[in-house]
Design a protein with these regions (language model features):
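N-terminal glycine-/serine-/threonine-rich beta1-alpha1-beta2 phosphate-ribose binding loop
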Residues: 2-157, 245-250, 291, 300
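Active-site-lining helix/loop region of Rossmann-like oxidoreductase modules
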Residues: 21, 60-63, 74, 85-88, ...
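Structural motif
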Residues: 21, 145, 171-172, 196
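Short gly/pro/ser/thr-enriched loop/turn and capping motifs at secondary-structure boundaries
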Residues: 28, 175-179, 199-204, 231-233
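Receiver (REC) domain switch-region micro-motif
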Residues: 142, 168, 305
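Rossmann-fold NAD(P)-binding glycine/threonine-rich loop
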Residues: 147-163, 171-192
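Rossmann-fold dehydrogenase core element
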Residues: 185-198, 219, 223
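NAD(P)-dependent Rossmann-like dehydrogenase/reductase catalytic/cofactor-binding core
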Residues: 317-375
């Protein structure tokens, strides 16, 4: 018997039914992770997980019930097969069993940029009625993994989540949870949303954010900073199309500078002394990402103090370690009748939440939320 049998949800036969929009590398790592950690002991400290049991829900209580894509090499396949098709190339952590869930053809809208169109064949199958499919699958939470720049497509799926009575987890930098108009739509519908733009487990954003804040805490003025990122997956190839990058650059930049108070770059997004964003595509890196970060400050006696570091990660597992909590937070919020942005989860797990909080405060609030406190 699996160790998760002691989770409150498992004892009552409750699950977190998720629908995944975009069956790419990130989705692959998430679904493989569900298999990898399904037998994790609830009371153990498990490498790679912040919470083996999140509220009532163990990792094993998360079930994939629907999937949507536009890639001809994925549509019509079982999710388990589709996740190892097309341009997917992330590191493998577990074998995914046959799930009995067919990938449906979703509407494209603006989801395929120029480089995607050059790399994949768009499915000729007629798009399905997404709302009807979500209801049929009895989905609780819709997870949007659409490519960067999919503004219209992401909003379409957010509306579908509302119409189907689902919570929504917005993993990409399209501003929905942080948009007052969209936040109100979810409040009016009585449904929760967590967003925007997933903050990886230990990625360039969280390390840069923490170190920038450390400069200020230790009395060093942060005068200028930069973060350059290169990777070899379809996300980075897609971002070669600079027109699709604007929201991504804003999201990554404000995630760092919003955590500052007194430095010249505090709160800045468009400033010559702050440069943060994706930089280039290097195909042989595959799903790895390399980040080069530099912080320049003024310390005691106005003496220069500079810090440089390089971070190497597998991009998709790094995000899955956060999404695995986000979907359970969304389900808890749904169970409790929380409407609108789930502030605690959004602030700790996302780059561009409705409210930016210091990470220690956000973490404390998230734990309070898990235990039944604030939303």
């Amino acid at each position: 018997m699996s160790n998760n049998s002691t989770s409150p949800a498992a004892a009552e036969g409750r699950t977190v039914n998720i629908a995944i929009v975009g069956l790419g590398n990130c989705a692959t790592s998430l679904v493989e992770g569900l298999e990898f950690y399904k037998d994790a002991a609830p009371d153990a400290e498990i490498p790679g997980l912040m919470h083996t049991v999140f509220g009532d829900y163990h990792v094993a209580d998360v079930k994939v019930v629907a999937g949507f894509d536009v890639d001809a090499d994925k549509v019509g396949k079982d999710v388990s097969e589709a996740l190892h098709s097309g341009q997917n190339q992330t590191i493998k952590i577990a074998d995914i069993p046959h799930l009995g869930v067919e990938v449906k053809r979703g509407p494209t809208h603006d989801g395929l940029g120029r480089y995607y169109q050059e790399s994949i064949e768009e499915s000729s199958v007629e798009p399905v009625d997404v709302v009807a499919e979500l209801k049929k699958a009895e989905a609780d939470v819709v997870v949007s993994y659409l490519p960067v720049g999919s503004e219209e497509a992401d909003r379409f799926y957010a509306q579908c989540a509302i119409d189907a009575g689902c919570a929504f987890v917005n993993a990409l930098p399209v501003f929905i949870a942080s948009d007052p108009e969209w936040a109100q739509k979810f409040r009016d519908a009585g449904l929760p949303i967590i967003g925007d733009d997933i903050k990886s487990q230990v990625g360039a954003t969280i390390t840069h954010r923490v170190l920038a804040h450390l400069f200020e805490e230790r009395g060093v003025r942060l005068d200028r900073t930069m973060q350059l990122n290169v990777g070899g997956n379809m996300d980075f190839k897609n971002m070669l199309e600079r027109e699709r990058l604007e929201s991504k650059k804003i999201s990554k930049t404000q995630a760092v500078t919003s955590n500052l108070k007194t430095s010249p770059v505090a709160g800045k997004v468009h400033d010559k002394n702050v440069h943060i964003g994706p930089s280039d595509y290097v195909g042989w890196l595959n799903d790895r990402k390399w980040a080069y970060v530099r912080l320049e400050g003024s310390a005691f006696g106005e003496v220069p103090l500079n810090l440089e570091y390089k971070l190497e990660v597998w991009d998709s597992p790094n995000s899955a370690g956060i999404i695995i909590d986000a979907v359970r937070a969304a389900k808890i919020a749904l169970d409790r009748g929380v409407a609108g942005p789930v502030e605690a989860a959004s602030s700790y797990l996302m780059k561009s939440p409705p409210t930016q909080l210091p990470d220690d405060v956000a973490r404390t609030q998230l734990e309070e939320f898990i235990s039944g406190g604030i939303a």
